[in-house]
Amino acid sequence: MNKIHLLDEKTVNKIAAGEVVERPASIVKELVENSIDAGSKNITVEILEGGIPYIKVTDDGCGMNEIDAVLAFERHATSKIRSDEDLFNITTLGFRGEALASIAAVSKVVLQTKEENETFGTRLVVEGGKILEKTRCGCQKGTSVEVKDVFFNTPARRKFLKRPSTEAMYVTEVVTRLCLSNPGISFKYVKDKKVQFITSGNGSIEDVILRLFGKEVHSALIFSEFEAEDLKVKAFATKNFLNYSNRNMQFFYVNGRYVKNKTLSAAVDEAFKTYVPSDRYPGVFLYLEINPRFIDVNIHPSKLEVKFSDDRRIFESVYRTIREALRESNLIPEVKLEKDLKNEEGQIGEQVKLSLPLFEVKEKTDDGAIFVREEVKTEEKIDKAPKHESSSDSERNVKRLSDIRIVGTLFSTYVIVEKGDVFYIIDQHAAHERILYEKLVSQYERVQSRQVTFPIVVELQPGDMEIVGQERELLYKLGYVFEEFGNNSVVLREVPVILGQPEAKKLFVEIVERLRDKDFSSKVSFKEEEIATMACKAAVKAMDTLSENEIYKLFEDLKIAENPYTCPHGRPVIISMTKTQLEKMFKRIK
């Protein structure tokens, strides 16, 4: 008896459906993408209990005639491509022709559709991949698809679904991504019979962000764009002080398709390096338009992954666009003190809470910015950087310190500065750290070093001598000149000029340990990390008393820094507070 045999069509369809339909959110994604490809201007998504028992997607797209409606449930039946050549010029979201067939194979589907100017529409009832009913019906132009009892015939798949609230969260994520990629379409999202949001469809990405994420995110947006042959980049990002513990607020789109791509993530990380802490992530809404021939979306049925033919070009374009937005924006956070609006019995007036957790960061909108940019136009609603031009970064990034008065220092750590109706508090250590970091980075080929009076002997762990030998050039660029001294020791002849001998020896050991314990794919990135550490060790510390001349020198150096807002590790250098806020706290005004 033969051991190998062909599977029947029903079983094949169920197996294939497993790649396309992972959960209710997958169904919503496929149906909405079909609606978008149909030219819809209004799309409604409704779910009950996470979409497990019920999903409905309604659109006003082109609709289908009876023949096309039936063909749509056949595997690999599509209107998007006709030959393998078309795979290299894909402009639609769907193209495999598997969506409806896969959905119908594991659920109960009711489809109603009608083309424009047709008297009647078509209604199909499909269960487990079989068409049970085909009738004429009266309906509006467009298509509506109801999906019931997901995985009703594959109980093994159904039991692996999460609880309804979790599945609903996945659906919400999918609808959110689709809204952001299609600002010209009005989306209505209804969950458990409650409207969650409605987008206007007016074509504004900013408006979609406002409706989905609220004023806090919208008010913190910065924007820049880049355009070259066969490539356009638009980047909306939150200012550095509004950041998150994961990448969930990062949305990447290539030719209108939501994608995940390591090159894009790396470009964002590099652009925000030293602007946010290493374990925090900014919100980013990134849109790329590129010739379809230079990308490959036919990697996986989910179509979430994309490959670029020239990763380096994409990386540099995205990095440059976001970095431009950061350079041309006011990134000073404003401190806001929340008030306790609950008055205890017999107590008059409001109590102001001064505990640390009540400090929150808010966008600075006052015109009296301490760093005033010359020859840069700003808009009231959003900080927009100009398109990339041939002028140098230094010309576009000129900052000057004007009309300020140094009030004094607080706790021998913070410098207080007054300008107009705003006062600023500067962390002297973070400010000096930023200044030293940028100075050292500018000396990229060789950090300035000095000869030591007496040789410094450094004892290393077994095996570290091989690492030191391999990375001699990197250590030299960091300011170290050394010789081997016995089996597991080296003698330092020159050390970075900004460090004292004890710190220089300690840092050398730390660098070797990090080279041993981590696989650094980018030596440039590693060098920048070590320079940041070097700057931190050499900078003035908290409780170091500065003279008035030293404070002014700190400001003179800070005002010409490329990024005067954060230290190399992403901590804020400067925060602000307004006179109005202070007067409200003292009840001088309401």
Swiss-Prot record:
Function of the molecule: This protein is involved in the repair of mismatches in DNA. It is required for dam-dependent methyl-directed DNA mismatch repair. May act as a 'molecular matchmaker', a protein that promotes the formation of a stable complex between two or more DNA-binding proteins in an ATP-dependent manner without itself being part of a final effector complex.
UniProt xrefs under SUPFAM superfamilies: ATPase domain of HSP90 chaperone/DNA topoisomerase II/histidine kinase, DNA mismatch repair protein MutL, Ribosomal protein S5 domain 2-like
MF terms (GO), sorted A to Z: ATP binding; ATP hydrolysis activity; ATP-dependent DNA damage sensor activity; mismatched DNA binding
Cross-referenced Pfam families: DNA_mis_repair, HATPase_c_3, MutL_C
Listed InterPro entries: DNA_mismatch_repair_CS (IPR014762), DNA_mismatch_repair_MutL (IPR020667), DNA_mismatch_S5_2-like (IPR013507), HATPase_C_sf (IPR036890), MutL/Mlh/PMS (IPR002099), MutL/Mlh/Pms-like (IPR038973), MutL_C (IPR014790), MutL_C_dimsub (IPR042120)
Originating species: Caldanaerobacter subterraneus subsp. tengcongensis (strain DSM 15242 / JCM 11007 / NBRC 100824 / MB4)
Gene: mutL
Protein name in the entry: DNA mismatch repair protein MutL
Family statement: Belongs to the DNA mismatch repair MutL/HexB family.
